[in-house]
């Protein structure tokens, strides 16, 4: 029975184990001088119903048939077939005609990836026939996980759809059957914007393999039952247009910037007239975004030094630099002083009401619903980079979006530690100002008597 994904708001990409279908690089030009990348430099169409192409290197054992094209099957433990292009494009347009693989724990993917681990992705979970995930990475940086998104894509396992990536120096556009589902601008992505020569990879792997980390297995929808396979993804055709020209692309320095890339016998952006998607003024809303939690490895990142696979799901994020409990005010009330013996001395006039710190924290956690997607907000103390500091008081709160999907998997409540107190803790916070006021009044009275 096909199961919907619980908590698809976990985006994509990364980890440190498992199958050969993951991303790696033979030579990282950010670390050393590497050979030039062979350029596509033109527009090409591949019809895989006619068989394989010498322009693609097979890994594993993809097969071909006249109806569906290239077939990538997981039939037993360790299977992770894919094809990868022998050429690179320096900005460009790719259209994949794909029918994704069903099956709990099975992951289908179509990826653009560079030698320095820039990456643009489509990924489908076999446990979910309703959604597709998109993601991007710059220089293999998996230090934050606010880049993934999920989009409506009902029936992706039942028939072929056209999935497009249009990539320029200013934006990335993801489309399904000609309809734009996401736009990323270079300005908004900053240093994480993919901007170096990319190869194409298409394939399938078992995220639910029992040897994988528990977190990876649960993200993939559960443990893969190989006896119920094989699980097959199909790539009927692929159209690719390189927006640059030449024979090869070379990194002239170790910056990874697109302006540092040179073309042998051509020009970067020399084929920009072939751009098929003009600037998109506004992007449609995505089905779900991932702002706050790390995500499990999804079959396209293997060797990234900054990531360690979590062993459980849901993950617990590290505490922020500010405490999520009530801030402590260590200063004395206005007019109060310490005597030479370090005794508290009230002002000579009427008693002063001490400032009592309070903070209202509200937690509304997302949970699965048979009515579909539910999104909840969690008020949390932000990290120091997003807070306005003030003595003894919390300045603001940050809102994280957690999305869940209708599922027949065992229900759970998404949880984030160091975000919001329990009900009892919240009551304690509300009672704190009253208790502090009573304490200060008693203290002032005792000092006045003695």
Swiss-Prot record:
<keyword id="KW-0336">GPI-anchor</keyword>
<protein>
    <recommendedName>
        <fullName>Crh-like protein 4</fullName>
        <ecNumber>3.2.1.14</ecNumber>
        <ecNumber>2.4.-.-</ecNumber>
    </recommendedName>
</protein>
<feature type="active site" description="Proton donor">
    <location>
        <position position="123"/>
    </location>
</feature>
<dbReference type="Pfam" id="PF00722">
    <property type="entry name" value="Glyco_hydro_16"/>
</dbReference>
<keyword id="KW-0472">Membrane</keyword>
<keyword id="KW-0326">Glycosidase</keyword>
<dbReference type="GO" id="GO:0005975">
    <property type="term" value="P:carbohydrate metabolic process"/>
</dbReference>
<feature type="binding site">
    <location>
        <position position="205"/>
    </location>
    <ligand>
        <name>chitin</name>
    </ligand>
</feature>
<dbReference type="InterPro" id="IPR000757">
    <property type="entry name" value="GH16"/>
</dbReference>
<dbReference type="InterPro" id="IPR013320">
    <property type="entry name" value="ConA-like_dom_sf"/>
</dbReference>
<feature type="disulfide bond">
    <location>
        <begin position="27"/>
        <end position="34"/>
    </location>
</feature>
<keyword id="KW-0325">Glycoprotein</keyword>
<feature type="binding site">
    <location>
        <position position="216"/>
    </location>
    <ligand>
        <name>chitin</name>
    </ligand>
</feature>
<comment type="function">
    <text>Dual chitinase/transglycosylase that plays a role in cell wall architecture. Chitinase and transglycosylase activities are coupled. Required for the polysaccharide cross-linking at the septa and the cell wall. More specifically, transfers chitin to 1,6-beta-glucan in the cell wall.</text>
</comment>
<keyword id="KW-0328">Glycosyltransferase</keyword>
<dbReference type="GO" id="GO:0016757">
    <property type="term" value="F:glycosyltransferase activity"/>
</dbReference>
<keyword id="KW-0732">Signal</keyword>
<dbReference type="GO" id="GO:0006030">
    <property type="term" value="P:chitin metabolic process"/>
</dbReference>
<dbReference type="GO" id="GO:0031505">
    <property type="term" value="P:fungal-type cell wall organization"/>
</dbReference>
<keyword id="KW-0961">Cell wall biogenesis/degradation</keyword>
<dbReference type="GO" id="GO:0009277">
    <property type="term" value="C:fungal-type cell wall"/>
</dbReference>
<comment type="similarity">
    <text>Belongs to the glycosyl hydrolase 16 family. CRH1 subfamily.</text>
</comment>
<keyword id="KW-0449">Lipoprotein</keyword>
<dbReference type="GO" id="GO:0004553">
    <property type="term" value="F:hydrolase activity, hydrolyzing O-glycosyl compounds"/>
</dbReference>
<keyword id="KW-0378">Hydrolase</keyword>
<dbReference type="GO" id="GO:0000131">
    <property type="term" value="C:incipient cellular bud site"/>
</dbReference>
<dbReference type="InterPro" id="IPR017168">
    <property type="entry name" value="Glyco_hydro_16_CRH1_prd"/>
</dbReference>
<keyword id="KW-1003">Cell membrane</keyword>
<keyword id="KW-0134">Cell wall</keyword>
<feature type="domain" description="GH16">
    <location>
        <begin position="46"/>
        <end position="228"/>
    </location>
</feature>
<feature type="signal peptide">
    <location>
        <begin position="1"/>
        <end position="21"/>
    </location>
</feature>
<feature type="binding site">
    <location>
        <position position="201"/>
    </location>
    <ligand>
        <name>chitin</name>
    </ligand>
</feature>
<keyword id="KW-1015">Disulfide bond</keyword>
<feature type="binding site">
    <location>
        <position position="123"/>
    </location>
    <ligand>
        <name>chitin</name>
    </ligand>
</feature>
<keyword id="KW-0964">Secreted</keyword>
<dbReference type="GO" id="GO:0098552">
    <property type="term" value="C:side of membrane"/>
</dbReference>
<keyword id="KW-0808">Transferase</keyword>
<feature type="active site" description="Nucleophile">
    <location>
        <position position="119"/>
    </location>
</feature>
<dbReference type="InterPro" id="IPR050546">
    <property type="entry name" value="Glycosyl_Hydrlase_16"/>
</dbReference>
<dbReference type="GO" id="GO:0005886">
    <property type="term" value="C:plasma membrane"/>
</dbReference>
<feature type="glycosylation site" description="N-linked (GlcNAc...) asparagine">
    <location>
        <position position="383"/>
    </location>
</feature>
């Amino acid at each position: 029975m096909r199961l919907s994904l619980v908590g698809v708001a976990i985006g994509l990409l990364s980890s440190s184990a498992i199958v050969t279908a993951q991303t790696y690089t033979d030579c990282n030009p950010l670390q050393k001088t590497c050979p030039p990348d062979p350029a596509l430099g033109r527009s090409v169409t591949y019809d895989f119903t006619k068989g394989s192409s010498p322009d693609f290197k097979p890994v594993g054992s993809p097969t071909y048939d006249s109806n569906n094209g290239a077939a990538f099957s997981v039939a037993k433990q360790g299977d992770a077939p894919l094809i990868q292009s022998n050429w690179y494009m320096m900005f460009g347009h790719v259209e994949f005609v794909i029918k994704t693989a069903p099956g709990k724990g099975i992951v289908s993917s179509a990826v653009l990836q560079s030698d320095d681990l820039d990456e643009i992705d489509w990924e489908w979970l076999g446990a979910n026939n309703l959604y597709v995930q998109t993601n991007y990475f710059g220089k293999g940086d998996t230090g934050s996980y606010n880049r993934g998104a999920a989009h409506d894509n009902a029936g992706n396992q039942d028939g072929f759809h056209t999935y497009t990536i249009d990539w320029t120096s200013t934006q990335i556009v993801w489309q399904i059957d000609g309809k734009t589902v996401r736009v990323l601008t270079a300005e908004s992505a900053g240093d994480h914007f993919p901007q170096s020569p990319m190869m194409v990879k298409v394939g399938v792997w078992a995220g639910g393999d029992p040897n994988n980390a528990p977190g990876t297995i649960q993200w993939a929808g559960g443990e893969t039952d190989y006896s119920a396979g094989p699980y097959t993804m199909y790539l009927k055709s692929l159209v690719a247009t390189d927006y640059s020209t030449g024979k090869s692309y070379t990194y002239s320095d170790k910056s990874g910037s697109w302006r540092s890339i040179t073309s042998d016998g051509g020009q970067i952006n020399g084929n920009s007239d072939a751009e098929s998607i003009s600037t998109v003024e506004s992007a449609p809303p995505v089905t779900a975004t991932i702002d706050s939690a790390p995500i499990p490895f999804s079959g396209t990142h293997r060797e990234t030094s900054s990531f360690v696979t979590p062993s459980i799901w849901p993950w617990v994020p590290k505490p922020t630099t500010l405490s999520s409990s009530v801030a402590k005010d260590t200063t004395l009330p206005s007019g109060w002083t310490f005597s030479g013996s370090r005794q508290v001395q009230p002002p000579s006039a009427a008693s002063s009401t001490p400032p009592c710190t309070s903070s209202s924290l509200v937690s509304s956690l997302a949970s699965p619903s048979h009515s579909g997607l539910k999104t909840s907000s969690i008020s949390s103390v932000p990290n120091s980079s997003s807070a306005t500091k003030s003595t003894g008081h919390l300045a603001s709160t940050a809102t994280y979006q957690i999305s869940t999907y209708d599922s027949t998997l065992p229900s759970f409540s998404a949880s984030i530690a160091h975000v919001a107190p329990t009900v009892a803790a919240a009551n304690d916070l509300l009672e704190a100002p009253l208790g502090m006021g009573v304490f200060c009044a008693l203290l002032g009275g005792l000092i006045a008597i003695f």
